[in-house]
Amino acid sequence: MGQGPSGGLNRQGDRKPDGGDKKEKKFEPAAPPARVGRKQRKQKGPEAAARLPTVTPSTKCKLRLLKLERIKDYLLMEEEFVANQERLKPQEEKAEEDRSKVDDLRGTPMSVGNLEELIDENHAIVSSSVGPEYYVGILSFVDKDQLEPGCSILMHNKVLSVVGILQDEVDPMVSVMKVEKAPLESYADIGGLEAQIQEIKEAVELPLTHPELYEDIGIKPPKGVILYGEPGTGKTLLAKAVANSTSATFLRVVGSELIQKYLGDGPKLVRELFRVADDLSPSIVFIDEIDAVGTKRYDAHSGGEREIQRTMLELLNQLDGFDSRGDVKVILATNRIESLDPALLRPGRIDRKIEFPLPDIKTRRRIFQIHTSKMTLSEDVNLEEFVMTKDEFSGADIKAICTEAGLLALRERRMKVTHPDFKKAKEKVMFKKKEGVPEGLYM
């Protein structure tokens, strides 16, 4: 139907030859059937020829390639390290030279020992810090006039020869006792206590500033004073005011600091304290809470009690020994004077005993004025109500009332302190004072 006589196409797409032109053809294998579901790769002529053949097994080849890459990285790292060493070599040589200069300046280390006995000008017996004693030589450049038994010396680290004398240094505990910065409190910050201020000025301050007045009148100024009274009456405050008003060296120590753990350390600390005070004279030694070491002597049953008594005996010796104290004044403070040893309070050691009573009405008013001078008070505050009260107030109690009133105002976000704040503060302070420590709290 509708087809011409020329014939159709064969399986390969070639036109079939006409029936009349029949010739014999060579055998050709049939083309493989096309794979279903897989796309054939297109072969590119020149690129396919240049591509390397597939090598098997591929896993071992990849591992070897990875190993070679790691070896290459290590070789590059080594090369970089060698280059850095060559570059840093001049800097290391300079650092080594600087270290050698520092070592030369520092010198060889020396050990510290004690001189036990001088044999002659060139030999001595010394003891090291380890313990043994040695017969050693004394080098020619050592100042032999300063050599005396018991002094500290410097010894060569290897041959233990005496190469120098170690000057006595201040005990670190004593250096801490020195007040470097004068306290801010002055006599104007003390409410009342006019008589006490006058007495301490005559006994402590005036002999240091104008000693010629005592020479003209023919008397020796007092060696020391003791301040005693109830807690919070201004004993330590007055001592701070003395330190503020005078230019003398002020050494402050608490009595409990003189009690040391090891035998003999307490008396040694007392001697060192007064030696430093003598070197830095004119000076004032203030020992607070003297009742810690100055209690009455009795038969001690333990080593600690005997050590406290030895410390007090050394204190008595320093106050009234053969060596004159000169420009060194002593101020003691305690609130238990009845427990002190009578030998400590006798004239010649402590010449003036200054009592600090509870403040009277005039003193209360002055103390309230001092502590409220920088406070912002409302108009309804009446301080006379607290001044005229019958409760026994100390100066510390009045300060606590003013501070507590300010805290109550801050709690309510107010910038002014009102009269009810002072009333609540007074009730709180007096309640705590009367209540005291609950019985059995520390049992």
From Swiss-Prot:
Entry keywords, A to Z: ATP-binding, Cytoplasm, Immunity, Innate immunity, Isopeptide bond, Nucleotide-binding, Nucleus, Proteasome, Stress response, Ubl conjugation
UniProt keyword ATP-binding, yes or no: yes
First-listed, main subcellular location of the protein, grouped into a coarse class: cytoplasm
Disruption phenotype: Displays disruption of cellular organization in the postembryonic root and shoot apical meristems. Leads to decreased 26SP accumulation, resulting in reduced rates of Ub-dependent proteolysis. Shows hypersensitivity to heat shock and increased oxidative stress tolerance. Displays enlarged leaves, stems, flowers, fruits, seeds and embryos, caused by increased cell size and shows increased branch number and nuclear size of trichomes, in correlation with increased ploidy. Mutant displays enhanced susceptibility to the fungal pathogen Golovinomyces cichoracearum.
GO biological process: female gamete generation; innate immune response; lateral root formation; leaf morphogenesis; maintenance of root meristem identity; male gamete generation; meristem growth; meristem structural organization
UniProt keyword rRNA-binding, yes or no: no
GO MF annotation list: ATP binding; ATP hydrolysis activity
Start and end residues of each stretch annotated as Disordered: 1-55, 87-108
Family annotation (Gene3D superfamilies): 1.10.8.60, Nucleic acid-binding proteins, P-loop containing nucleotide triphosphate hydrolases
UniProt function note: The 26S protease is involved in the ATP-dependent degradation of ubiquitinated proteins. The regulatory (or ATPase) complex confers ATP dependency and substrate specificity to the 26S complex. Interacts with transit peptides of proteins targeted to the chloroplast, and may be involved in the degradation of unimported plastid protein precursors. Is required for the maintenance of postembryonic root and shoot meristems. Has a specific role in the regulation of organs size. Acts redundantly with RPT2B in the regulation of gametogenesis.
Subunit structure: Component of the 19S regulatory particle (RP/PA700) base subcomplex of the 26S proteasome. The 26S proteasome is composed of a core protease (CP), known as the 20S proteasome, capped at one or both ends by the 19S regulatory particle (RP/PA700). The RP/PA700 complex is composed of at least 17 different subunits in two subcomplexes, the base and the lid, which form the portions proximal and distal to the 20S proteolytic core, respectively. Required for innate immunity. Interacts with UNI.
Designated name of the protein: 26S proteasome regulatory subunit 4 homolog A
Species: Arabidopsis thaliana (Mouse-ear cress)
